[in-house]
C-alpha cells in the first residue's frame, strides 16, 4: 500500500467557515438567504476546489485519477417530498481512469458528518459478478482487512 503525503499548506485544509456556512444554511435553506450568501459560498467553493485538486495530486502518486467532480449545491427536488433547494454538504468524487480501472474515492464535508469513502458505487451486474468470482478464487486480502482489530471494533465480525 502506498502512503500519500501532502504539503502543509492552505490548499490541504478546509476553511472553517465552510462548516459555519453549512450550519447557517441548514437553518436557512431557502433561496432568499442563499442569494445574500452567494458570494461567500463561491469563495468557499473555490477553496474546496483547490483542496480537491491538491488531494488529486496526492492520489495520483498512488493511483490513476482521471477526473475530480465537485457536486453542485443545488438539490434536484422534482421527485422529493423534501423541497429544500440546497444540499448542506460538499461532495467530492475522484474517478479512476476508465475502462481499465473501476471504483473511486469520495469526500463528504459537512458540519457533523464528514467522511471519506472508497470503492465501487453501484456496480453493473457484470462487474458485480466479477467481484464475486474474484472473492471466490482468493478472498485472503479481504479477510486480512476485516480481521484487523480496528475493523472489528468499528464494524463487528462479518
Regions found by a protein language model. Give the residues of each.
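Pyridoxal 5′-phosphate
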Residues: 1-11
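Acidic, low-complexity proline/glycine-rich segments
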Residues: 11-17
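Contiguous, amphipathic alpha-helical segments that mediate oligomerization or scaffolding
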Residues: 17-62
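Hydrophobic/aromatic-rich structural module bridging two neighboring secondary-structure elements via a short loop
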Residues: 60-102
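Compact, glycine/acidic-enriched structural inserts
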Residues: 112-158
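Short, hydrophobic/aromatic-rich beta-strand segments within well-structured domains
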Residues: 91-95, 104-109, 115-119
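Short, intrinsically disordered, low-complexity segments enriched in Ser/Thr and Pro
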Residues: 56-74, 131-134, 139-145
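Short, hydrophobic/aromatic alpha-helical segments in well-folded domains
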Residues: 20-21, 37-40, 93, 117, ...
